[in-house]
């Protein structure tokens, strides 16, 4: 059985790690390099960095910090933020990132997924999907530009159809960001993740809602995702990664100790 991945997520803005609630009200929580090194030493399986304002500001993320991270940690890491072309992705990967993730740029130009797949291989290409549950219609809807509350907007896609499309275009992995759960620590959206798992034949990573170690056990056992991404519970030392992995193992969830 493949080990489940524990993935701290670091939202980056102006060279600092920040965190909000439901994609709003971001506050600075620390230095990128300091936090990356700490998570690597604590036993994280990989890291994800989102430069949250890059797509909104129509620019590529700052590749200088990518190079610094690559020199100082020895676990895989994925980078996202304003990657709109093969050339953009190459700049990030050349600086040492293991994977690149695209979100809003893929919605604007879906063929970008195939271009990245063809150039770098499936294993490098992650697609992030920001999914909002509309309580009125009961539908899961894809949003874009969520790094800025003033720019965030609904797209033409429903989540299920976009999941199918990005797979067809060559995505190697999907990170499903459940917007209603983001930062509130009430548990992952297992119902939504289970529905997406049925459609998804590539690795699926859960994001949004982790509040306790039991939440990780539940999401792995009940929705069968491949990894779980979390931010605030790690940034604020609510959960220790080493203790979490031992807890998973004790609850019959495979984890790298």
From Swiss-Prot:
The record's gene field reads hisF
Q: How does it assemble?
A: Heterodimer of HisH and HisF.
A single GO molecular-function term is: imidazoleglycerol-phosphate synthase activity
Reported function: IGPS catalyzes the conversion of PRFAR and glutamine to IGP, AICAR and glutamate. The HisF subunit catalyzes the cyclization activity that produces IGP and AICAR from PRFAR using the ammonia provided by the HisH subunit.
* Taxonomic classification: Bacteria, Pseudomonadati, Pseudomonadota, Gammaproteobacteria, Alteromonadales
Q: What is its main location?
A: cytoplasm
Which pathway does it operate in?
Amino-acid biosynthesis; L-histidine biosynthesis; L-histidine from 5-phospho-alpha-D-ribose 1-diphosphate: step 5/9
* Superkingdom of source: Bacteria
Q: Per the record, what are the reactions this protein catalyses?
A: 5-[(5-phospho-1-deoxy-D-ribulos-1-ylimino)methylamino]-1-(5-phospho-beta-D-ribosyl)imidazole-4-carboxamide + L-glutamine = D-erythro-1-(imidazol-4-yl)glycerol 3-phosphate + 5-amino-1-(5-phospho-beta-D-ribosyl)imidazole-4-carboxamide + L-glutamate + H(+)
A Pfam family that the UniProt record links to this protein: His_biosynth
InterPro entries documented for this protein: Aldolase_TIM (IPR013785), His_biosynth (IPR006062), HisF (IPR004651), IGPS_HisA/HisF (IPR050064), RibuloseP-bd_barrel (IPR011060)
Q: Mention any one GO cellular component term assigned to this protein in its UniProt record.
A: cytoplasm
Q: What are the catalytic residues? A: 11, 130
By sequence similarity, the record places it as follows: Belongs to the HisA/HisF family.
The identity of this protein, by name, is Imidazole glycerol phosphate synthase subunit HisF
Listed A to Z, the keywords are: Amino-acid biosynthesis, Cytoplasm, Histidine biosynthesis, Lyase
Localization recorded for this chain is: Cytoplasm
Q: A GO term (biological process) for this protein?
A: L-histidine biosynthetic process
EC number(s) on record?
4.3.2.10
Source organism (scientific name): Pseudoalteromonas translucida (strain TAC 125)
């Amino acid at each position: 059985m493949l080990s489940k991945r524990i993935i701290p997520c670091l939202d980056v803005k102006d060279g600092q790690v920040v965190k909000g609630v439901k994609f709003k009200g971001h506050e600075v929580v620390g230095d990128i390099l300091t936090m990356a090194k700490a998570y690597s030493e604590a036993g994280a399986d990989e890291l994800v960095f989102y430069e949250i304002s890059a797509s909104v500001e129509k620019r590529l993320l700052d590749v200088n910090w990518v190079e610094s991270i690559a020199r100082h940690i020895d676990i895989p890491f994925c980078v996202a933020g304003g990657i709109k072309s093969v050339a953009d992705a190459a700049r990030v990967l050349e600086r040492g990132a293991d994977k690149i993730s695209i979100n809003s740029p893929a919605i604007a130009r879906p063929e970008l997924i195939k271009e990245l797949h063809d150039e770098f291989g499936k294993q490098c290409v992650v697609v992030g999907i920001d999914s909002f549950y509309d309580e009125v219609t009961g539908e899961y809807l894809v949003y874009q530009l969520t790094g800025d509350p003033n720019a965030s907007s609904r797209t033409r896609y429903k989540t299920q159809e976009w999941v199918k499309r990005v797979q067809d275009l060559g995505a190697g992995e999907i990170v499903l960001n459940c917007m209603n759960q983001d930062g509130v620590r009430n548990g992952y959206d297992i119902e939504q993740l289970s529905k997406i798992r049925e459609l998804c034949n590539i690795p699926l990573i859960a994001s949004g809602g982790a509040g306790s170690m039991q939440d990780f056990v539940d999401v792995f056992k009940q929705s069968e995702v491949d990894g779980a991404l979390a931010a605030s519970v790690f940034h604020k030392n609510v959960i220790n990664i080493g203790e979490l992995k031992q807890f998973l193992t004790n609850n019959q969830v495979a984890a790298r100790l």
